[in-house]
A protein has these predicted regions:
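Internal hydrophobic scaffold segments of catalytic domains
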Residues: 1, 68-83
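Hydrophobic beta-strand residues in large extracellular and virion-surface proteins
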Residues: 1, 45, 74, 95, ...
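Mature extracellular/periplasmic domains of secretome proteins
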Residues: 33-40, 61-70
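Loop/turn elements at helix/coil->beta-strand transitions in domains of secreted/extracellular proteins
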Residues: 40-43, 70-73, 135-139
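Soluble non-cytosolic domains of exported or imported proteins
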Residues: 54-65, 119, 159-167
């Protein structure tokens, strides 16, 4: 699988290395799996929501995913667009989001080699500007300048969307200042 295209490791994930049995979880068996979470054996839970259309059901599965991720590494297989983000904490187990088109769901074991480096207290800068209006009304327009880091060797630069956002911001500021 190709990082950033076929799968994304959630930014709050901890590192993990090894080969693990995969247990498929659904709304019928999750509680029995959670009860056995104290058993010391290599295990990853997998939730496949790629065929679920109902938003409420997907929301329930997302809650279940978050509950299970407190006790297990989680594979989340869905049709959702893979998006990178940032986190301000590290969980005990990784969560791997997998594009459903990239994987055959008939696997029973998975091999992982996840390294994680969390930079606590990282400082960044953004720019804020203000144009005084003629009346006592305010319009606040903002854009960010930073980017979202890396996952392994895959970089998530912010230059494209940030440059267009900052450009729009400057054009709006120019327009409203006239």
């Amino acid at each position: 699988l190709v990082p950033g295209k076929d799968f994304m490791i959630s930014p709050h994930s901890s590192g993990l290395k090894g080969t693990f049995n995969v247990v498929k979880v659904d709304l019928n068996n999750w509680s029995s799996i959670l009860k056995n979470s104290k058993v010391n054996h290599p295990l990853i839970v997998s939730l496949n929501v790629s065929k679920i259309i109902d938003r409420d059901t997907i929301s329930i599965y997302k809650e279940l995913r978050n509950i299970l991720n407190k006790s297990f590494p989680v594979l989340w297989i869905s049709t959702e667009k893979l998006q990178w983000s940032v986190a301000d904490y590290v969980s005990n187990f990784p969560m791997i989001k997998i594009a459903s088109k990239s994987v055959n769901y008939d696997f029973s074991r998975v091999q992982l080699n996840i390294e994680h480096k969390f930079k606590k207290g990282l400082k960044t800068q953004n720019v804020v500007g203000m144009v005084s209006g003629r009346r006592k009304k305010s319009i606040i327009i903002s854009a960010h300048y930073d980017h979202l880091g890396m996952m392994g060797q895959v970089k998530f630069p912010g230059a494209n969307d940030n440059a267009s956002g900052v450009s729009l911001l400057l054009n709006l500021a120019s327009y409203y200042s006239e």
